[in-house]
Amino acid sequence: MASVLEKVLRVGEGRTLRKLQNYAKAVNQLEEDFTHLTDEELKNETVELRERHANGESLDDLLPEAFAAVREASRRTLGLRHFDVQIMGGAALHLGNIAEMKTGEGKTLVATLPAYLNAIASRGVHVITVNDYLASYQSELMGRVFRALGMTTGVILAGQTPQQRREQYAADITYGTNNEFGFDYLRDNMAWQASDMVQRGHFFAVVDEVDSILIDEARTPLIISGPSAGDANRWFTEFATVAKRLVPEVDYEVDEKKRTVGVLEAGIEKVEDHLGIDNLYESANTPLISFLNNSIKAKALFKKDKDYVVMNGEVLIVDEHTGRILMGRRYNEGIHQAIEAKEGVAVKAENQTLATVTLQNYFRLYKKLSGMTGTAETEAAEFMSTYKLGVVPIPTNRPMQRKDQSDLIYKNEKAKFEQVVEDIAERHAAGQPVLVGTTSVEKSEYLSKLLAKKGVRHEVLNAKNHAREAAIVAQAGRLGSVTVATNMAGRGTDIMLGGNAEFLAVAAMNARGLSPVETPEQYETEWDDVFADVKAEVDEEAAKVIEAGGLYVLGTERHESRRIDNQLRGRSGRQGDPGESRFYLSLTDDLMRLFNNGAAASLMGRDSVPDDVAIESKVVSRAIRSAQGQVEARNAEIRKNVLKYDDVLNRQREAIYGDRRHILEGDDLQERSQRFLEAVIDDVLDSHIGEGNGDDWDFDALWTELKTLYPISITIDEVITEAGSKGRVNRDFVRREILSDAKLAYSKREEQLGGAAMRELERRVVLSVIDRRWREHLYEMDYLKDGIGLRAMAQRDPLVEYQREGFALFQQMMGAIREETVGFLFNLEVEVQAPADAESVGPRIQAKGLAANQATADKLRYTAPTDDGGVEVRNQRGQIEKAATAKAQKDQQAEDAVLVGEDEPETPQGPPARGAFGQPTGASSSAPQNREERRKADRRK
């Protein structure tokens, strides 16, 4: 029964559909007019629509003509005419909704409609896909439609240079994955020059497979990180050895449902004996506890060939939703290192966060957001609460003919798979194509062996051979084909009966060496003939497949998400084709074992039902729905909490990134420097003097601190003399004198360097200090979040505590930024150089002890989320990151030292050592310390 919230969300659905139908009618009325246009006249429609929009007409007003133009361009270039329901879907997207369209209804073609309409505003449109292959394929194919209308298309792919990315973003419509768009946003907010930025804003986005991207992948943030120092690798290896000696239920206990472990007293004693320590839980040993927990989790919760595989000396994650190997992705929080130590392969270093954003908060940046999927209704409430997106179900073009059969339940897995093989063999013999869905690599290979033994020819599409996945899926609807797939979520390629003519035609064109980008004229000339030949062959075979019953989808296990099950079923019965689906289950399936197993087990009885006899039962079906509901609710709660905590950081991120953007865009920093100077002097005075008079003040300590900030020229005696006596010196008087002296020093500094050089120095100093302090702040916030759950033990709300303490940390960071900026401005040794060439604006400066953050760009890692908590790590060039070696760590530390104002180690002939702000002092160089850090150091002494 639908929940109250679901009923509320469906209110107005009929009214929305009527509005969309009216748009479709308006487009149909214009269709004949557009068919009479020449190619040149059709292309000029874009120019005319842009002029009208510039003169005040809204995009809503232009929708019928824009959609009619796209429909005609598509008919001419691709031979595909948008159906009325596709026009309705396009209108729903333009209005900022999620269009729920069943598999095979042509979502890729639908996206061209709102993309073109919103590109009329000349502010850039982003079409987000689930992988690089689909981004490239769709931009190439749909780019032909946009080019016929005089618009440009770009694609963002891993490994592109900043210049290439800038060019792709400058296009009217840009395709790419959520990871690439998100990382470019983060990189833009680490840029040193405005010219280094690649994106031009966040105007409108269409997200394909929106549930996969905005729901499944929303639990883990995008992270840009660099290698961190430490000897953690040794401890991972040490604790992997310890974990092997620990016995389940004696030394530790495991909760598979909650994915947690707990160490028992006997286990703690074994660990303490192995390490030679008295108490694992005393403060000095606290960091070791996480190593112990991770090593036990790696042993008990993460299974080889199910959760991960080991290939070429690397641990590679298997995506639980798609069954693919996630190349370069890693579990976070030390889990991946623990698994590497368990398997005896090289343990890679953990990384330090430099920039991060969740997908929820990245997509909230868009002025207007929309999405498409075949299965959004189950998550409608979350889409509305998180993204303010309504879900609009779009009718199918033709009535659904697929028959969804009841589940068959067996006592054990062996009996289940025996019956699965018999069913497949029978369908295969009749020529009916079969698509089999499994939940793991291990099970797909087990089934493959059984099919081979039975003599059934088949293709296996799993995490170990996904390079050919698009080609395999495109042919899964051919006569007599059998395809075993670990999962069909996010595949993105239609299974058409008789074969995918469009895919085959593109492959044939590529085989001829033709490209719509590099050889557009020849491509357009030959496309029609090639497509017609392929289509004729496919249509002939499709008729035979329809006679055999259409595509048969067989699921070997229920997934924990109803959407994944529905996506698998949805591969059959596209566009009104006949089809059939059925799930085979057993009592030993993971979902049945972990949730509600009792009801099913009691129904079947351990002795009364033979192994090879299946039952169909409403009790079991209810148990499955209940189990899936529990898992979905748990995952939704995780995403909700991720968002709550990231919202705290997001407000801080917006403030910092907004500051950086203004600086990059040329804000005059002179006024900011003056404000910083006043604030820092106020802070110094607050820490050294009270509200009374000077009799009780420590003037020596005050002047010592001021000298670290700027070259103070007035003396204590001069201030006292000016006031008349020490007792007549008050705070306002001292502040006025010191501030006057500091501003005079600032003017002298500007006069010495020149106005233009001073502005450039201010820009570089502020950016450098902001970036380093923000990086350290992210580390502090991570550390705070890791331990914030303990506040609940003190009867305090962890989220409220996180907000309060996070704000305090932010205030401390801002104070440190102000203080260090002032110190650097006055104390850095600066060499002013003439412009490099006639085109350069202003002088160049060399500031000793200050370096741009791009120094570490080649060592940055890019971490992308997966729905199972794993992370994808690539380097700056988009290549999979293989290892964080000791040398890389050493190099990173050296570059970090430069970034924080240190010099390289001196040789006897080298320059003098520099102090906290890069000034020559004759003392050893050290990391910049703000006032709070210096006090902590003093207290330790």
Swiss-Prot record:
<keyword id="KW-0811">Translocation</keyword>
<dbReference type="Pfam" id="PF07517">
    <property type="entry name" value="SecA_DEAD"/>
</dbReference>
<keyword id="KW-1003">Cell membrane</keyword>
<dbReference type="InterPro" id="IPR011130">
    <property type="entry name" value="SecA_preprotein_X-link_dom"/>
</dbReference>
<feature type="binding site">
    <location>
        <begin position="104"/>
        <end position="108"/>
    </location>
    <ligand>
        <name>ATP</name>
    </ligand>
</feature>
<dbReference type="GO" id="GO:0005886">
    <property type="term" value="C:plasma membrane"/>
</dbReference>
<dbReference type="Pfam" id="PF21090">
    <property type="entry name" value="P-loop_SecA"/>
</dbReference>
<keyword id="KW-0472">Membrane</keyword>
<dbReference type="GO" id="GO:0043952">
    <property type="term" value="P:protein transport by the Sec complex"/>
</dbReference>
<dbReference type="InterPro" id="IPR001650">
    <property type="entry name" value="Helicase_C-like"/>
</dbReference>
<dbReference type="GO" id="GO:0005829">
    <property type="term" value="C:cytosol"/>
</dbReference>
<keyword id="KW-0067">ATP-binding</keyword>
<keyword id="KW-0653">Protein transport</keyword>
<feature type="compositionally biased region" description="Basic and acidic residues">
    <location>
        <begin position="930"/>
        <end position="941"/>
    </location>
</feature>
<dbReference type="InterPro" id="IPR044722">
    <property type="entry name" value="SecA_SF2_C"/>
</dbReference>
<dbReference type="Pfam" id="PF01043">
    <property type="entry name" value="SecA_PP_bind"/>
</dbReference>
<protein>
    <recommendedName>
        <fullName>Protein translocase subunit SecA</fullName>
        <ecNumber>7.4.2.8</ecNumber>
    </recommendedName>
</protein>
<dbReference type="InterPro" id="IPR014001">
    <property type="entry name" value="Helicase_ATP-bd"/>
</dbReference>
<dbReference type="GO" id="GO:0065002">
    <property type="term" value="P:intracellular protein transmembrane transport"/>
</dbReference>
<dbReference type="InterPro" id="IPR036266">
    <property type="entry name" value="SecA_Wing/Scaffold_sf"/>
</dbReference>
<dbReference type="Pfam" id="PF07516">
    <property type="entry name" value="SecA_SW"/>
</dbReference>
<dbReference type="GO" id="GO:0006605">
    <property type="term" value="P:protein targeting"/>
</dbReference>
<dbReference type="InterPro" id="IPR000185">
    <property type="entry name" value="SecA"/>
</dbReference>
<dbReference type="GO" id="GO:0031522">
    <property type="term" value="C:cell envelope Sec protein transport complex"/>
</dbReference>
<feature type="binding site">
    <location>
        <position position="494"/>
    </location>
    <ligand>
        <name>ATP</name>
    </ligand>
</feature>
<dbReference type="InterPro" id="IPR011116">
    <property type="entry name" value="SecA_Wing/Scaffold"/>
</dbReference>
<keyword id="KW-1278">Translocase</keyword>
<dbReference type="GO" id="GO:0005524">
    <property type="term" value="F:ATP binding"/>
</dbReference>
<comment type="similarity">
    <text>Belongs to the SecA family.</text>
</comment>
<keyword id="KW-0547">Nucleotide-binding</keyword>
<dbReference type="GO" id="GO:0008564">
    <property type="term" value="F:protein-exporting ATPase activity"/>
</dbReference>
<keyword id="KW-0963">Cytoplasm</keyword>
<dbReference type="InterPro" id="IPR027417">
    <property type="entry name" value="P-loop_NTPase"/>
</dbReference>
<dbReference type="InterPro" id="IPR011115">
    <property type="entry name" value="SecA_DEAD"/>
</dbReference>
<feature type="region of interest" description="Disordered">
    <location>
        <begin position="880"/>
        <end position="941"/>
    </location>
</feature>
<dbReference type="InterPro" id="IPR020937">
    <property type="entry name" value="SecA_CS"/>
</dbReference>
<dbReference type="InterPro" id="IPR036670">
    <property type="entry name" value="SecA_X-link_sf"/>
</dbReference>
<dbReference type="GO" id="GO:0017038">
    <property type="term" value="P:protein import"/>
</dbReference>
<feature type="binding site">
    <location>
        <position position="86"/>
    </location>
    <ligand>
        <name>ATP</name>
    </ligand>
</feature>
<keyword id="KW-0813">Transport</keyword>
<dbReference type="InterPro" id="IPR014018">
    <property type="entry name" value="SecA_motor_DEAD"/>
</dbReference>
<comment type="function">
    <text>Part of the Sec protein translocase complex. Interacts with the SecYEG preprotein conducting channel. Has a central role in coupling the hydrolysis of ATP to the transfer of proteins into and across the cell membrane, serving as an ATP-driven molecular motor driving the stepwise translocation of polypeptide chains across the membrane.</text>
</comment>
